[in-house]
Regions:
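Catalytic alpha-helical scaffold of carbohydrate-active enzymes acting on polysaccharides/glycoconjugates
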Residues: 1-152, 177-200, 206-254
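A structural motif
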Residues: 146-164
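Binuclear metal-dependent hydrolase catalytic cores centered on His/Asp/Glu-rich metal-binding motifs
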Residues: 158, 164-179
């Protein structure tokens, strides 16, 4: 099967595969070391097949108390690619595999390629998921209407996403560092009137390369040097929102 986003429509796609495999073999552990320096726990968008092929990643992530979100079976298959009648079964399968591998049922979800059908939020809520990240429409959590259960958006960031910055827009590592710091500066200023979510999407095969990783380290050092920065996970943000704002989204606690 061709690798989504690699630029090749052929299989086997050796360059596309080896770069991504490098991320699983080397890059992810390099990211672990950097995050650990700053006492940051990752919120991992976990393809279920990673649980089956790379158990060492799960083991090391659990040691660091990382959060695991559902992220489909594989990034090569969007939720939009499945027949409509199969989507719920796929969500259930992903939840079962992730729960079995990590020891905890995932509470969050981001679709491969941010893909959703009109039924996805309802299916997720029915299966016990409580937040979704596909909707990067705000800088704060947003409640969603679902048929059963409950659901909110904890926004995923596209602007300083390392794939967009490096692969699609061809920025340098130095420019990435400056972009992340500028992004943070604006959110930090705006947080005076209400908290903001700074989601920093990292892909091990992108930011985990040797000549890029130190710029992530520099950016995190800058961010964490500021007072009042909450180094937290997606679920902890969602849980806070549910406990304080879900029933009255317009309320502000000064």
């Amino acid at each position: 099967m061709p690798i989504r986003g690699s630029g090749s429509n052929h299989a086997p796609d050796v360059p596309g595969y080896t770069l991504r495999d490098y991320g699983s073999r080397v890059g992810v552990f390099r990211i672990m070391d950097v995050l650990e320096q700053f006492n940051i726990r990752a919120s991992v968008l976990l393809n279920a097949e990673v649980c089956q092929h790379h158990p060492a990643i799960i083991e090391e992530g659990n040691k660091r108390e990382w959060e695991w979100l559902g992220h489909g079976m594989t990034n090569s298959i969007s939720m939009l690619d499945y027949p409509v009648e199969e989507e719920l079964d796929i969500i259930r399968k992903v939840k079962q595999i992730v729960t079995s591998a990590t020891g905890k049922a995932p509470k969050g979800w981001l679709g491969p390629g941010l893909g959703e059908t009109f039924n996805t939020p309802d299916h997720l809520a029915a299966e016990g998921f409580e937040y979704v990240c596909d909707w990067g429409c705000d800088e704060q959590p947003v409640p969603m209407r679902v048929k059963s259960g409950r659901m909110i958006v904890v926004p995923y960031e596209l602007g300083v996403n390392d794939i967009r910055v490096f692969i699609r827009e061809n920025h340098t590592p130095e420019e990435y560092y400056r972009m992340v710091c500028d992004h943070f500066d604006t959110l930090y200023r705006d947080s005076a009137t209400g908290g903001r979510v700074l989601c920093l999407p990292l892909h091990p095969f992108v930011i985990g390369l040797p000549y890029r990783i130190k710029y992530l380290e520099k950016a995190l050092d800058y961010i964490c040097s500021h007072d009042g920065v909450w180094r937290t996970t997606g679920w902890e943000i969602a849980d806070w929102y549910y406990r304080h704002y879900y029933e009255d989204p317009g309320r502000y606690e000064g």
